[in-house]
Amino acid sequence: MRKIIVGSRKSKLALTQTNWFIDQLQALGLPYEFEVKEIVTKGDVILDVTLSKVGGKGLFVKEIEHALLTKEIDMAVHSMKDMPAVLPAGLTIGCIPKRVDPRDAFISKNGKSFKELAKGATLGTSSLRRSAQLLAARPDLQVKWIRGNIDTRLRKLQEENYDAIILATAGLKRMGWDNDVITEHLDESLCVPAVGQGALAIECREDDKDLLQLLAHMNDAATERTVAAERVFLHKLEGGCQVPIAGYATLQENGKIKLHALVGSTDGSVLLKETVVGTNPETVGLEAAERLIHQGAKELISAANKEQQ
């Protein structure tokens, strides 16, 4: 019986996601056993500055990918939104399980909705994507950066100078929080989700054919296609955490992919949006990127990158 070593960040959410996925694999009843190896990433250590200022995407995966390449671990369970658009040589995404709710969750201290927040209220987020879109809708709001795990952020909302915070619905659901803390789910028309939000990425070595065969049982074809369109879009624009960039694709009844794509200025004064429908994920992602580039997305990305230096 082969033992598969599964790498995970030490956070409660990461371990919950990893153990959930291992449970799904064990339910297949195949001759494998699993062991979790906890790994500390740079993003877990640096908590006093915004992600955009310390390297953005990849902060939560680099050390784990190193462990994969050196064969300390055999696979890793990531939040797809933490994954850079390009993987290191020798690694691949072995499967993408079915996506859960991709929306952002708005949580206020007093139960007021986003529209009902008082003028000048303080909103806590560590995401340029969220802050740009919400400032575009409510320029009167004050954005204050907030870091830490889900429990820490919920505690900070109650104890510190925040009127509301934004978190990913998927993470809250996986941790057992949901309607008991969420004031409202933000519709994509107000806040387009991050590329890959709500999906998991199971990463492994591309030469591990045995493991790839096992992971294929857990792949969700619809999620794979929609996330592929989002990631092609992200890759073409070379966007990371340093840039307000968003992409969310859905599969329509006719089998076509519909991608909502957005690039903004960091202050939310400019939001460029495109919606593209098509059959091929790569074509859809590239077209969305090209249309936004035509609108001036590259200039916004360049300006955002300069601001973070």
Curated annotation (Swiss-Prot):
It catalyses: 4 porphobilinogen + H2O = hydroxymethylbilane + 4 NH4(+). PROSITE patterns: PORPHOBILINOGEN_DEAM. It comes from the Bacteria. GO terms for molecular function: hydroxymethylbilane synthase activity. Its cofactor is dipyrromethane. Binds 1 dipyrromethane group covalently. GO terms for biological process: protoporphyrinogen IX biosynthetic process. Its EC number is 2.5.1.61. The modification S-(dipyrrolylmethanemethyl)cysteine is found at residue 241. GO terms for cellular component: cytoplasm. Disulfide bonds: none annotated. Keywords: Porphyrin biosynthesis, Transferase. The keyword Repressor does not apply. Pathway: Porphyrin-containing compound metabolism; protoporphyrin-IX biosynthesis; coproporphyrinogen-III from 5-aminolevulinate: step 2/4. The porphobilinogen subunits are added to the dipyrromethane group. Tetrapolymerization of the monopyrrole PBG into the hydroxymethylbilane pre-uroporphyrinogen in several discrete steps. Belongs to the HMBS family. Monomer. PANTHER family: PORPHOBILINOGEN DEAMINASE (PTHR11557:SF0). This is Porphobilinogen deaminase. It comes from Bacillus cytotoxicus (strain DSM 22905 / CIP 110041 / 391-98 / NVH 391-98).
